[in-house]
Amino acid sequence: MSLDDRLMKSATLIGLKINDAGGHKLGAIREVFIDRDAGIARYVAVEPAGLFAAGGKYRPLPWRLLTWDDKDEVYVADLTKDRFKEAPAYDRDQLGSTTYAWAEQVEKFFDTGQV
């Protein structure tokens, strides 16, 4: 697979589905957060699907937890549906503010030590 085959426009990412490894739908990408210094995607804000979507909260996931599934054209998150439900959730205004330190909270939750 060439580099060109792996590139995706940012507008294409918005709305893409995210499943867990078992194929359960977790939600859809609503925002992508780019590290302005490194020039890479760090997080996606996922709008949960189904019954636990109530409340209008988004769950940010570290990009490194995602793997692209060519067959189903979805991202697969390296976590269970239950773990996703437990992940920190924020409204859109909170995600747009540095006041909440949401990235640090997300890193701590997923225990990745990447901040």
Where are the language model's segments positioned?
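Peripheral interaction segments used for macromolecular assembly
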Residues: 1-115
